[in-house]
């Protein structure tokens, strides 16, 4: 065993001990030598705000063209602030919802004021990734100058061709949507995917006291994994057994429908409509690429997120077999059995063009068992490099030592882990 392979083994062992479903494969020792063992795998969660494309409509809803003054609900008659699209210091374009704020300076997108009341002040914000994603934590929308009194969060799973409501928000759910108000904590394992209306994020408490509107993901996970999410195996088991649960957290696009702005805890005051508008400083979407449990990495390729597929799969979401592998054998990976899951790997020797080489034999129509002097998926590579001694016993000694060290590391990390 070369030092490079030894280090690879050690690193993969350490990574496997640290996290679930972050490895697609690792080298294991068998009677036939070291072979790849495949696992269900998924990319790490990250903030998707840097990758989202923002579209705001209707046209002209963003303030500043023409320039206009506005007030705040706390100081409704001090209308000294101005929005001017032609002045970078006074402009509030949509991209300020996803920029990195520096030196404590808050930047935000802002709409025109409600000067056309009683015509509704409506705005749609569509977030697109051109990629299937899965929510992994709470979605946060940060509003400046007050949260909307009525709003809807929609999602699409087909790149915006069709939409479905994700959650309703209102200061009075019964009046706005004819729905009884609920919180996520009111839900049970049997109705955790229910679309609810919540009043939790729409009541007036002052624009500076509470700015965030959330779509709660952690609380939904906690129904299965416990309040501290320490029983993730239970969640992953439910993801497999409960119809619609995985799809509930899956999306390609999100849309905010802003239906009525903050009113300051009272009715619309028609003598001063310059204090009514929407302003958003940040949208944070913690998620991971959906790769059907066939990839541990997701990279930006030509401007689009792309799963780096394993298990003989391909496609943006690893949604089909590689060329030369039977399409009918494709399946999404499974979280079960925990902790490594089932990769549902497409067979490596199910086509004539993929017959094992150099005297290798096909084992259970899944992998090639190679003669001692050859290696590789199809036994296509010689184990002995030119000019090197292939009969040294040091390889066996190093392999044994690594396996012992790997076992010790796994037990040590399991002892230290809160899970």
Language model regions located:
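Flexible, disordered linker segments and immediate boundary regions flanking tandem C2H2 zinc-finger modules
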Residues: 177-180, 328-337, 387-392
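Aromatic, loop-rich ligand-recognition surfaces of beta-strand-rich domains
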Residues: 2-51, 60-65, 77, 101-172, ...
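Non-cytosolic beta-sandwich-type ligand-binding/adhesion modules
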Residues: 39, 47-51, 55-57, 66-104, ...
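C-terminal GPI-anchoring signal of eukaryotic secretory precursors
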Residues: 358, 383-403
């Amino acid at each position: 065993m070369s030092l490079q392979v030894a280090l690879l083994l050690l690193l993969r062992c350490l990574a496997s001990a640290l996290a679930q479903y972050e490895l697609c494969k690792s080298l294991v020792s068998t009677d036939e030598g070291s072979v790849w063992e495949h696992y269900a795998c998924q990319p790490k969660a990250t903030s998707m705000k840097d990758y989202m494309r923002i579209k705001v409509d209707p046209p002209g809803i963003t303030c500043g063209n023409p320039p206009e003054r506005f007030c705040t609900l706390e100081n409704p008659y001090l209308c000294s602030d101005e929005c001017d699209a032609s002045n970078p210091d006074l402009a509030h374009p949509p991209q300020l919802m996803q920029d990195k704020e520096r030196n404590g300076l808050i930047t935000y997108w802002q709409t025109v004021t409600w000067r056309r009341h009683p015509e509704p002040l409506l705005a749609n914000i569509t977030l697109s990734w051109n990629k299937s994603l899965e929510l992994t934590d709470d979605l946060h929308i940060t509003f400046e100058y007050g949260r909307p009194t009525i709003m809807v969060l929609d999602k699409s799973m087909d790149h915006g061709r069709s939409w479905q409501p994700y959650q309703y928000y209102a200061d009075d759910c019964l009046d706005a949507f004819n729905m009884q108000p609920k919180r996520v904590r009111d839900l049970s394992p049997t109705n955790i995917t229910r679309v609810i209306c919540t009043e939790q994020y729409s009541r007036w408490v002052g624009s500076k006291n509470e700015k965030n509107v959330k779509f709660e993901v952690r609380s939904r996970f906690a129904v299965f994994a416990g309040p501290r999410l320490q029983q993730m195996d239970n969640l992953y088991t439910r993801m497999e057994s409960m119809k619609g649960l995985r799809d509930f957290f899956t999306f390609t696009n999100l849309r905010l429908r802003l239906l009525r702005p903050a009113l300051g805890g009272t009715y619309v005051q028609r003598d001063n409509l310059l204090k009514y508008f929407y302003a958003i400083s940040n949208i944070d979407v913690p998620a991971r690429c959906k790769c059907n449990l066939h990839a541990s990495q997701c990279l930006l390729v030509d401007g689009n997120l792309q799963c780096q597929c394993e298990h003989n799969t391909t496609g943006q979401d690893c949604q089909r077999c590689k060329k030369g592998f039977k399409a009918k054998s494709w399946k999404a990976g499974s979280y079960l059995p925990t902790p490594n899951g089932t990769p549902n790997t497409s067979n490596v020797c199910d086509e004539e063009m993929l017959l094992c080489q150099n005297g290798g034999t096909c084992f259970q129509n899944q992998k090639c068992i190679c003669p001692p002097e050859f290696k590789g998926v199809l036994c296509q590579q010689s184990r002995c490099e030119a000019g090197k001694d292939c009969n040294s016993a040091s390889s066996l000694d190093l392999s044994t030592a690594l396996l012992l060290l790997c076992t010790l590391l796994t037990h040590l990390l399991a002892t230290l882990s809160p899970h």
